[in-house]
Structures are given as structure tokens and as C-alpha cells.
Amino acid sequence: MECIERLRRKRTEYLFKNFIMIKFSFFNYRINMRNFHATSLRFIKFNYSAIKNIRNFSTEKKSEPKLSLFLTNISKILSEHKKDLYKAQEIIETEWLKLATPSIDVKSDIKSTMYAKQRLIHGRAFDLLKLYKSNGNLNKISKSLKDYIVNEKFIFIAWSYLLASYSKSSLPNLDYRIGYSITRHIYRESYKNDFMSFEDFPEYNKFDLGFFVKLGDIFINTFTSPLNPIFERVFENEIYSLKINKEYEYEIMESLVISPKALPMVCPPLIWWHGIRGGSVINLNDNADDSLVVGSFHHSHKIAISDKLYSVINKLNAFKFKINADLLSYLQNEGSFIIDFYKKTKKDTYINNMITLDIAKTYLNTPFYLNVNIDWRGRIYTQSFYLGYQGSELSLALINLFEGQKLDEEGLFFFYVYGANIYNEGGKFSKKSFQDRFNWVVENLDNIIAMDKDFILKAESPTLFAAFCLTMRKLKENPDHPVFNPIFLDATCSGVQHFAAMLLDLELGKYVNLINSGESVNDFYSQLIPAINKAINESAEKKLKNVKFSDISLNRSLLKKVIMTKSYNVTTYGITEQLKSKLEKVEKIIISKGKEIKVYDYLVPTKNGKFVVLDTFEVETLASIINDNIFNQFPKLHSIYEYLTRLTKIYLKLDIPISCSTPDGLELTQRYNLSKVQKLTINFLGKNRTAVLRSWVSDKDSRREVPAIIPNIIHSLDAAHLPMLIDSWDSYILPIHDCFGTHPNDMFKLAEQVRECFILLYSKNDFLSKIDSKFRENLKDYKIEIVNKNGEDFVKIKGTPRYDYLPLPVLPQMGELNVEDIRDMGKYMIS
């Protein structure tokens, strides 16, 4: 039987190769040219059995996938240039599109079978692209660009975009991003000159939003066609998206192509400064257009970057890392059950995890750096997508500090505390003292050293905990063994911490551990849950439609993210989506307009340990009740929300820019542009559906300005806190927004410095008063009069036919919190 199967596969391989050479002529097919749309490419007639044979040949593998050609070539470059890693980085950044195709000098080092397997994905995609040109389909996109479009490197660009973004972007968004990126490459290589900027290029050629979407979808079709079905198009909840065809997981892993921007750097990133592009080596090139500020390009936000922030970025970029070799080896051998566990429980991240492992193998023997960017609020983000301290749990676990240290007494203590934190089975350590967490590790040393499968999988973060256990094994053998693992402590709902300090609210400060005289940790989330459940239950008595809510009992795991994001002004819709992502789903089919539609009900826990079934509309009602009652016991939070939103509305009424200064001197301007909806008809599997696309214009989107002001202010305060901290710190510091990482030996000092900088943020900077003063200065600059009537300030707005007077918001009343007390009583501010 095995012999017959081998012959069948060889025959299939032969047929497929000849099938490519004769441009698919033995398939009786045609492309539907009527009502053409980029997403309507579909094969009307083809031999399904032949495709099935091809699919079986390409996916029947009995061994683990090999390292992709792309990563193999990067490994070769790193090895050949290990004494000049700047040169290695330069080659990777400038030649990355060539690394996926064997050249004369590297082909001898690559097994021909690997090359053949890679061609099964990229080769099929490129042949399909050439087919679309020969059949005239590219003429429907652009006659002027059709010859430029058929370029194999654009297949690699599209492929790298798909791998990085398929799971978190809608299909129309992917279409646009790929089409836009390819158009930009065509412009740079063939059209760039002194007479036309890229901004003018689309207008000159009459390329609208639909053009970019259609061009991108042509390339996506090369990976979703029945002849190359690596991804599957799905349509759920009125949204088109992609999912990976599970039969092709091994082929995908052996065909990786990753943009250098998503990879670590092997030399220190270039220095950023005013007017000087830093980061990637390619930024020395005049054609490069990388910016330190990323995200929100559709809008007109502004940030004036300070000298201090540039220095902080350069300091973070200079930190050196290496792969955790012990963990990588463990996950590939006796610890492979963790990856299998993720494959079963987190299917949507499995491919990304496998890519992360392959990148770790590639950089195993090479030190690396993690390039960072900022957004317009000053928030810091690592650029490396698959391997970085702001990435997935696996990504973080595989990173070690390049310079290790023997643990001192404080380092050992906080290393144990961190071990308990990442185990945290069932959230049991949320209220425990540091000493209790330390004691838990001492009591479980035998289990930790044994690394039993069941024990590891009970951890909240299995890969991080496995890395901890492996280091503990080394420490048992040799207490002087240097430790390279970074450890992290997390702030208690940092948004509320900022509001508590801003308002000097003593009670609120206690709940979020700014002030805590005891050894038990206050759990802000648990404090709010009883009142939320009470409001939900009482709604059943007030409204008959809420009768199902009478026994609902939501727990901490369901409400933690809701409460945390409410401090960032999350909407009822946002709460609904968070609940739906956490609750157990029950699929059902309903009939609408004669069509079957898949929808979900949700199982919501009750007081008696059972569940009540709610449909989507009932979950929305539940979210609305939560939103209305979540902060009722803290009226000062409502007062600051009211103040900031009213201030924003006046800015909008007067049509002047919404701007503020952060305590560290950053000048920020918030400005959302209006988006317009464009509908395109998409033909998918013979059925017409409508995709909603958005384009942005320069008009202000007033509806977004008001709800965005609170999260943007809080994010900017988080961002202001970090530069103060990093600027005063001489060792490793790894920021994950409101989470702080360093070597275990430095964690005690880092926690102290976090408190000191937080105190400095609010003791010397009366932030709310400065916002109010800045607002009044802006009114003066725009020659807008403030009038006082009976002790109340009004702004004079010219109306028709008379002047209108709009009352100015009054600053919230301050409380009795002494921020200096945080120094000695804020031990659990980060825990």
C-alpha cells in the first residue's frame, strides 16, 4: 500500500508540474468576465478531483516542517557575517524579497525538496498572477500598471502581509493594505522622480479606494483560488475575513516570508533625533520613509517630540537580547505538549506561535535588538511582530536579557514572586502579598523542578512558567548560575490610578493600591463586582424583558477587562464585544428572508452555578446595564468624565484644535478625520455580497472626538510616566504600557522608581488645572471672549442673529490624597 501511495503522489506531482507549464490548459476552465470585480475572480469549471489530488500531495507529511527557505537564508547570512552584524542587517533589510527565491550562490545549500515545496505555494500564486494577466483580468485593474503588477516579489509582499494580519484584519482592509503597499513599491521603482510625489501618483492615475482594494484582492486570490487554497474566505456577522486552510499548515511554515520590520534587528538600531530617521538600517536610504510615529495615519493628530522622548527611544533600542535556548529546546522536545495544548485551545494563534518558534531558531545564536516606535500620544510599541516583549506569551517567554546576573537576595525574592504571578491558577494570587507568593514557590519547589505536564498546564501562562521552571532547575544545580530571564510587575488598573492621583481621591487610591498600609492586595475589580451584579439582578424586577437577569452572577474573569477598559471610556458596544468574547457560545441556525444564517447564543453564569442562555440582543442589554452602573460607587470618576467631555464639546463648538501638554512636556493635538463609507459588491462562491470600505477625508469627525478624549488623555499620561522612569534608569527596562519589566535583581529598585516618577507626575504638575489653563489660553489665542455672570464663566459664541453663551465646565473638587504617601504606602501599586 505504501508503495502504491508513493507512486500516486509522484504521478500527482508530475501532473501538477505539467499543469503549470501548459498554463492549466487541461482543466476545462474559464474566468467569469461579466460584472468583473477583483474579488469576483472564480473558476466556473475545473476538475475538482485533480485539485483534491494536488491538495493531498502537498499536505501529506509525516515529519515536522523544515525551516523555510527565507529563514534558512537569513540563518546563512547571520552565520557568514557574524563578525559584521551591521552588514548582515543591511542585507536582510535590502534583499529580503530575494531571500525567498534560491539564487546561484545559495541554491547548493538548499535541499531541492524544500525548494519544490516552497514553489507549491509561491510558485502556484505567481503562475495564477501571470494567468490573470494573460486572460485580461489585470486590464480591469489598470492597463498602465499591468506589466508592473506581474512581479514575483509582490507575491512575497502579499504573503508576508497575510501571515502577519489575516487573523486580525477584515478582508477588505487586507485588500486595501496589500494593494496600497504594492502600488507604493511600483511608484518607488518605476515612477519616482522630482516631478511627482507618491501623494500625487494615485490622483494622476485616477486610482481611488476601489483600485487599491481590487489590486490587493487580485493578490489575495492567488492564495485563495481552488488551485492554491492556502486561505479560505469566510463571511460571518456581515464581515469578510480569511482563515488558514488547516490542511496546509506545514506548507505555510516551510514557505514563510516575513518583512524585516516584523523581525528583530541584529545590530543596534540607528539613532532617532529631530529631522534624523533612526531605527532600521534602510532609513539611511533617501527612498526610505519610515517614521518614528506610527498608527492613525488616516487622522490628523500631532505630537511634538521632545528631546527626552528621543533619548528614551534610543535607550530602549540599545538594549540587547538573546533567545532563551533552554526554553526553545524544551518546547521542541519534552515540552512540546505546551504547543499541542495551544493548538487545541488557541487555534487562531497556532500559526503565529509556530512562526515565532521558527524565528527563534533562526536567531538562536545571534544577539538582537528590538526596535521601538511611538504613537501620536507618546505610547511606546516594539516593532518586531513575532518576537518581542510586547508580543504573545510565547514571544515574551523566548526572550532573554543578553547580560545575566547571579541572583542576590532581592532578586531571588522577586524571581519567586514572578513565578507565582505567572502560575496564578484560577487567579488565586490577585489578592496575595508578595510574601505569600514567595512562600507558594518554596512550597511547590518539587513540582516546579519536576515540571510535570499537568502541573505546567494549570499555569495561567504555561510557556512563561516553563521558562521560570527551567531556570529554577539551573539554580538548584548551581545557586550562582546567572539568570537572564526578565520579570514583570503589572499596575493595578492604571487608568483608575491616574484618575485617583489626578483627583487626589483617597478612597479610590486605596482601591487601586496607591495607598495600602497592609499586606493584602486590594483587588479593585472584585470591589466593583457585587454592585454590578446587584444592578443586573434588580433590572429583572424593573423590566419584564430582563426577567432572565434575576439570577445572573458575573465573576472577575468576565468583568476584569470590562472594568479596566471602562476607565478608558469604553462604550456599551465595546463591553458587549468583550462579554461575547469571554462567554461560552452556542451555535444555532435561524432563517432570515428564506436563508439560513449562523448566529450564537451565550451561556451566562448564575448564582446557583448554572447558566442562563442569552441571545445577542440580551447580551447588549446586559452590557448597557453594566456600563450605566460600573462606577456608581465612585462619583468623582463621573465628575472628571463630565469635565473632560464638556471641555471637548466646547472645543468642537468653537472649531479650535483640541490640544494639551503632558507633564513631561509633550504637546499633543487630537484631530479625527471623517470617514466615508463606500460599498463594493463582492462575488464570493457565486453569491453577491456587499463589503463596507472606509475612506478618510480632511473634514473633522466630531462624533469621535468626545468619546476619544478620555482614553487618549490616560494613554498620554501612561506615556508621560514612562519617559520619566526610563530616563532615570540605568539598567534594562522593558515597558508594556502599564507593565514594567527588568532583571529580578533590579525589580525592587524599579518598583520604587515607578512610585517616585508617579509622585513626580502629580505632585509638581497639577494636571487638571493645567488642562483648564491651556484651554483658556487657547480661547485667548483665538480671540474668543470669556464672560463671567454671577460667578460662573461662559464662553461667548457668535450665533445667529445674536451671541450665545456656553457655560464653561468647572474643575472637579479635589480630595484628600497626599501623593507623597504613595512612596511608602504604594508597595502594591505594581504587583
UniProtKB/Swiss-Prot annotation:
PROSITE patterns named in the record: RNA_POL_PHAGE_1, RNA_POL_PHAGE_2
SUPFAM superfamilies recorded: DNA/RNA polymerases
InterPro entries tied to this protein: DNA-dir_Rpol_C_phage-type (IPR046950), DNA-dir_Rpol_phage-type (IPR002092), DNA/RNA_pol_sf (IPR043502)
Domain of life (superkingdom): Eukaryota
EC number: 2.7.7.6
One GO BP: mitochondrial transcription
Cell compartments where the protein resides: Mitochondrion
Enzyme class, first EC level, given as a word: transferase
Reactions catalysed, as given in the entry: RNA(n) + a ribonucleoside 5'-triphosphate = RNA(n+1) + diphosphate
Active site: 490, 560, 738
Main location, first listed in the record: mitochondrion
One cellular-component annotation, GO: mitochondrial DNA-directed RNA polymerase complex
GO molecular function: DNA-directed RNA polymerase activity; mitochondrial promoter sequence-specific DNA binding
UniProt keywords, alphabetically: DNA-directed RNA polymerase, Mitochondrion, Nucleotidyltransferase, Plasmid, Transcription, Transferase
PANTHER family: DNA-DIRECTED RNA POLYMERASE, MITOCHONDRIAL
The family this protein is said to belong to: Belongs to the phage and mitochondrial RNA polymerase family.
Function: DNA-dependent RNA polymerase catalyzes the transcription of DNA into RNA using the four ribonucleoside triphosphates as substrates.
Protein name: Probable DNA-directed RNA polymerase
Organism: Gelasinospora sp. (strain G114)
Classification of source organism: Eukaryota, Fungi, Dikarya, Ascomycota, Pezizomycotina
